[in-house]
Amino acid sequence: MTTSPAFRSLLRAATSASILMLASCATAPPAPTRPPADTRSEIVRRMPAKVADRDRWAADIETAFAAQRIEPTSENICAVLAITEQESGYVANPAVANLPKIARGEIDRRAAALHVPKFMVDAALAVRSPDGRSYAERLRSVRTERDLSELYEDLIGSVPLGKRLFADYNPVQTGGPMQVGIPFAEANASRYPYPVEGSIRDEVFTRRGGLYFGIAHLLGYQTPYTRKVHRFADYNAGWYASRNAAFQNAVAVATGNTLALDGDVLAPGAPLDKPGQTERALRELGPQLGMDNAQLRRALQQADQLQFSDSALHAQVFALADARAGKALPRALIPGIRLDSPKITRELTTEWFANRVDGRYRQCLQR
């Protein structure tokens, strides 16, 4: 289920993906020229020995590469396998520990926020659901995000209190073997190569769908990075978060301010007269940059796109920061984000995630 920083990153990635998808219509990359059988053979070889149904995993990964015109290089194959191993251990619809407790907590939290008494919640959950069981019985038996997503969909669609609590918003926002964001998948389904019998949400919880959209989120955009670890960090924190965290660091060095290097250079929804931390610090450089507040805002609005790396603002800020530091500062940094989710039972960060995936990636390249 989605966390606040992660949800912002999903929205950022979905928006960026839509922009890139439109831009790529006229300039789609050529289809991979490698024979599909060769690609599948390499995928099988590079998987850990313990993985079951290796041929099926390989087929779905190869299909996703071909449909999205992503070159199936060893590096790209291992990037996908590393994320999949980290996120699910090669389980299409992985179980989540303590999910019934987590789900009931979410329902109770929403009820409390709306001042709905507990007895009304209990009465709503006692209603018989479309599969014949009560919602309370189903809630006690959920084991996977797909189970919970289907329960929420039925609860919202069939029980008045469900619609009141969730307002047509299903709290399950990630799923599948690569734990990809469902909003991202829904925004990027135009080239999905399989028939959709239910919804894109349903497809995310399958092996083929989870891999297709996970691969799109991981590899479906160009980056300025020279190391895969920054792409892995972006997978967790949002497209271009590593590039933007480095930009925040440059702003901090150039101004002498302490900034959170979280990759969010614009506070979501902030009006022009109430800028976020990074934008506020950047305004101190406005006279040196020859840019007023409105111009800075417009420039920062490109930070979810590749071309921000080549923008005048990016170049000028790094020129000032490099001069002050007396050396060239990094152009990519893993964002400093603490992962926050009911599914997480210990303190983890984006850096931890990216480095864990990078370790699996390097092991894969050696197989």
Regions found by a protein language model. Give the residues of each.
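Bacterial N-terminal signal peptides
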Residues: A13-A23
